[in-house]
């Protein structure tokens, strides 16, 4: 197969591994800088141009679209879909998963466990908003934040009010969530490929920190997940319509709670921790499922 990898940087671990895994299995792998692809939208025959030439003959496309280029990246991916190229994850599923609030609304509708979450616009509603999630300590999250940036733990009511007021004053969209103390600064990253959890790791925040992101100095270790956690991760990816997803789960006193569903999960942490050839499993999934013109919009909303 001829497989496109949409990535800003061919030297990134995840991009490199996907290219290696594809080439090892006899496929032609082409890395395309997402922001350098351009399109004639109204042309009768959909096309994408790159460095002065049309992109042709692709069987599948692997989107590795960073959060900051979601809008343009999804437009390029949509154009590939119009050309009948099979996407590892569909554009509509990626844009759905990048909207944190929309994601939680969809997961909630399907009865998937979530931390109690509040959202408001007016500063007048701050006391009610805090009460809604059970009071302090609580977590405040910027809706546009990634990799733990824009996530604040407020240990007192006063601190929570001040931080929420500050964010609202800057006209930033935030959500307020209950703090799951019993998780002890740890979460579980479940790597889902084609309705199976193919690998899982526990991420533990460094001492004095509550965010477990590896980018923030967290450490990763092997973990045995429960059948309920496995089912939760698979269902969450399915609701979002993602074939490949990193589902982040907290262990709480009332079962697994989904924190986030990531449509472009990094491979380095999960491969290094588990020793699994995740890139190879992704290429295998494409071999079994990539059919020309097969873009089914999975998930609803």
Curated annotation (Swiss-Prot):
Cystine pairings recorded for this chain: none
Binding site for Mn(2+) 2: 260, 262
Residues where ATP binds: 141, 178-179, 187, 211-213
Binding site for Mg(2+) 2: 260, 262
One of the record's GO cellular component terms: cytoplasm
Enzyme Commission no: 6.3.2.-
Cofactor(s) recorded in Swiss-Prot or TrEMBL: Mg(2+); Mn(2+)
PROSITE patterns named among the record's database cross-references: ATP_GRASP
Binding-site list for Mg(2+) 1: 248, 260
UniProt-recorded Gene Ontology molecular function terms: ATP binding; metal ion binding; ribosomal S6-glutamic acid ligase activity
Cofactor note: Binds 2 magnesium or manganese ions per subunit.
Keyword Magnesium: yes
BP terms from Gene Ontology: protein modification process; SOS response; translation
InterPro entries assigned: ATP-grasp, ATP-grasp_RimK-type, ATP_grasp_subdomain_1, RimK, Rimk_N, Rp_bS6_RimK/Lys_biosynth_LsyX
Positions with a binding annotation for Mn(2+) 1: 248, 260
Nucleotide-binding as UniProt keyword: yes
Keywords: ATP-binding, Ligase, Magnesium, Manganese, Metal-binding, Nucleotide-binding, Protein biosynthesis
Pfam families linked: RimK, Rimk_N
All residue ranges annotated as the ATP-grasp domain in the record: 104-287
Domain of life: Bacteria
Family: Belongs to the RimK family.
Protein name: Probable alpha-L-glutamate ligase
Source species of the chain: Azotobacter vinelandii (strain DJ / ATCC BAA-1303)
Underlying gene: rimK
